[in-house]
A protein has these predicted regions:
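Beta-strand-dense domains in secreted/periplasmic systems and polymorphic toxin scaffolds
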Residues: 1, 19-21, 48, 81, ...
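Surface-exposed extracellular loop regions of Gram-negative outer-membrane beta-barrel proteins
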Residues: 1-13
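Short beta-strand segments and strand-loop junctions that repeat across beta-rich extracellular domains
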Residues: 20-27, 155-160
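Tryptophan-centered short beta-strand motifs
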Residues: 28-32, 165
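A motif-centric feature for acidic-aromatic and gly/ser/thr-rich catalytic loops and repeats
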Residues: 54-75, 79-155, 161
Length: 178
């Protein structure tokens, strides 16, 4: 089918997504379009790397909504994003609301270069600005998967369009965390 896509993920022993591979259907076969590798500090991502393990994006984090560095899973703790993809390292700075949702990115000259507005369930109402697409860390400071629109909350995925998680609460399931 035209526009068909597929995504595969590789997880480590702590259930952190380490590699994301995206594919598009070419009409006769699946063709890999990109690969992202994640580097973590505890349970929060600090860096994204390409398939050659070269940094493409680095996140600077501070204290999250809990007042610690990872107590709220990093929600509201994003400070800066450094884009390594161009020849000149480009920095953007996060602005978030009281719930830890990223509402804007500013450049080093304090110009707003991206704005994000969400409904209460995380559906994007408005995404604007020249660098809006660069940032995948948005609702609840979590990364959104570009093809599915789902948010990675580490132990499970959230779909704002459906206003629900893709699986039951892992703590309430018998037989494991998935």
């Amino acid at each position: 089918e035209p526009g068909a896509w597929m995504s595969t993920n590789v997880y480590d022993g702590k259930l952190r997504r380490r590699i994301e591979r995206n594919y598009r259907w070419s009409g006769s076969a699946w063709v890999q379009t990109n690969e992202v590798r994640f580097v973590y500090d505890g349970n929060v991502a600090l860096q994204e790397r390409n398939e050659f393990n070269v940094p493409s994006l680095t996140l600077t984090r501070g204290m999250d909504l809990s007042g610690s560095f990872q107590g709220a899973g990093g929600i509201g703790g994003l400070l800066a994003l450094s884009d390594h993809k161009s020849r000149i390292l480009d920095h953007s700075y996060f602005h978030a609301d009281g719930n830890g949702n990223v509402t804007a990115l500013a450049d080093t000259n304090q110009n707003v270069v991206a704005r994000y507005l969400y409904d209460p369930f995380g559906n994007p109402l408005s995404i604007s600005g020249p660098k809006a697409a660069l940032n995948r860390y948005r609702f609840s400071s979590k990364p959104v998967h570009e093809l599915s629109g789902m948010y990675d909350y580490l132990f499970r995925w959230y779909t704002p369009e459906l206003q629900r998680w893709d699986n039951r609460d892992p703590l309430n399931e018998v037989g494991g965390i998935n």
